[in-house]
């Protein structure tokens, strides 16, 4: 019995050492919670996801660690894409989505026990990807502590067809906000420079 317990504890310790177990557990719980919440039929409607800075989120300066913003943004997108039906539509079409680009700007630190909201909006899309904005808003004064822009690349289909599957009709992308236009140009310029440095042709799938 003691041997079995020791082996079990060893396996659990190994799993927690080799995998980010809490990320997968929390991600699954976020999706499950979103699935039982009311469906958000407006794809462009802003979605709010609540959070609080806990001790394990802190860096050496006792602020929320920079990497934690990206992690929390993941969970907020999971909730938004599930409640809006985006994940379900992609699954029905046999497609998937990956992060193809991300830029975050930090404006003010979030401190221990500080509560915040992540306000997620789908801004627009092109023939390959969705463009998403996420704002970290401190609830004490509604200040935007950080803002994140991401490019969610659709694999195995196109954003147009995914949206059409969700809305049961053809829907045009909203006009690109100015910051998205500049951000796309930056990404394109960076891709061209990296390809030139590595000798990769412009028709490569890797950007």
UniProtKB/Swiss-Prot annotation:
Cysteine pairs bridged by disulfides in the record: none
GO cellular component labels: extracellular region
Major localization class: secreted
Entry-linked PANTHER family: PROTEIN THEM6 (PTHR12475:SF4), PTHR12475
Signal peptide: 1-27
Cell location: Secreted
Keywords: Glycoprotein, Secreted, Signal
SUPFAM superfamilies listed in its UniProt record: Thioesterase/thiol ester dehydrase-isomerase
Name listed for the protein in its UniProt record: Protein THEM6
Any one Pfam family match given in the protein's UniProt record, by short name: 4HBT_2
Gene encoding the protein: them6
Positions glycosylated per UniProt: 187
Originating species: Xenopus laevis
Highest rank taxon of the organism: Eukaryota
CDD domains: 4HBT (cd00586)
Protein family (similarity comment): Belongs to the THEM6 family.
